[in-house]
UniProtKB/Swiss-Prot annotation:
<keyword id="KW-0186">Copper</keyword>
<keyword id="KW-0249">Electron transport</keyword>
<keyword id="KW-0679">Respiratory chain</keyword>
<keyword id="KW-1133">Transmembrane helix</keyword>
<dbReference type="GO" id="GO:0005507">
    <property type="term" value="F:copper ion binding"/>
</dbReference>
<feature type="transmembrane region" description="Helical">
    <location>
        <begin position="48"/>
        <end position="68"/>
    </location>
</feature>
<feature type="binding site">
    <location>
        <position position="253"/>
    </location>
    <ligand>
        <name>Cu cation</name>
    </ligand>
</feature>
<dbReference type="InterPro" id="IPR008972">
    <property type="entry name" value="Cupredoxin"/>
</dbReference>
<keyword id="KW-0812">Transmembrane</keyword>
<dbReference type="GO" id="GO:0005886">
    <property type="term" value="C:plasma membrane"/>
</dbReference>
<dbReference type="Pfam" id="PF00116">
    <property type="entry name" value="COX2"/>
</dbReference>
<comment type="similarity">
    <text>Belongs to the cytochrome c oxidase subunit 2 family.</text>
</comment>
<dbReference type="InterPro" id="IPR045187">
    <property type="entry name" value="CcO_II"/>
</dbReference>
<feature type="transmembrane region" description="Helical">
    <location>
        <begin position="87"/>
        <end position="107"/>
    </location>
</feature>
<feature type="signal peptide">
    <location>
        <begin position="1"/>
        <end position="20"/>
    </location>
</feature>
<dbReference type="InterPro" id="IPR002429">
    <property type="entry name" value="CcO_II-like_C"/>
</dbReference>
<dbReference type="GO" id="GO:0004129">
    <property type="term" value="F:cytochrome-c oxidase activity"/>
</dbReference>
Amino acid sequence: MKIPGSVITLLIGVVITVVSLWYGQNHGLMPVAASADAEKVDGIFNYMMTIATGLFLLVEGVLVYCLIRFRRRKDDQTDGPPIEGNVPLEILWTAIPTVIVFTLAVYSFEVYNNLGGLDPTISRDNAGQQMAHNHMGHMGSMGNMVAMAGDGDVALGIGLDSEEQGVNPLMVDVKGIQYAWIFTYPETGIISGELHAPIDRPVQLNMEAGDVIHAFWIPQLRLKQDVIPGRGSTLVFNASTPGQYPVICAELCGAYHGGMKSVFYAHTPEEYDDWVAANAPAPTESMAMTLPKATTAMTPNEYLAPYAKEMGVQTEALAQLKDQTSPVGDLL
């Protein structure tokens, strides 16, 4: 019994759909997802992979079928049918990519917005008014226009979604130089060549380049942000999986660009506290002397004793100076 062509086409469509859906979710091309935001990025990547797999199987399948079905037969000297264009087919293969691209654009915009890429707290009108003001005040100076653009209150960065904006993040200052990353923790005074942060707590990286443009990239977080000289940028994330992850410069920054790497350590809260305790700078003796003390119960000699010792002044000399009268009145 001959199987109808419509049934064969339906079966082929079902097979292509099943294979595309399975491979789109099980391709294994992405590294481990170390944050909730990474799962959002993986969602759009898996969606794109599903569509790409289906299109690949469909197009390559049609090509292989045509190569076999319409190959030149032995002793066939005839010409093919004079077909010139196919308007319905051209409309179809124009409409399908249009729908796919539009769907991907809407989906990617939604993901980018959820990641905090569009900062609703920064007014774009404010930036425009500032640019117009500088343009009117310094009509002939393009240098002022460029400097204004760098100093404006324009959001440059990516961060948490709106539901997590109220959480107090761990602040880390990041300096990108050829060819290293320097991480400074203002809360503890720690300076490190590696990034350390606890899981399940937002981390805000305030980044700036010291020479050329760099790009801060942690693949496991699915986040990348340009680091620009003279202009700060921000990257906010919330790691969810403990581990060691590479920090990579993703912008060609010089001859040794490939060696500009560091490590991000995602600790448990207890491990992070231990790291801070082990690496926090110890207060020096001079710093300890500046700490507040209960001075109300001290005598003048007791209060001045530590300072006199540091200056090399003996208490006996201070007592002699106290007993002496000033000769200033005799000189006047």
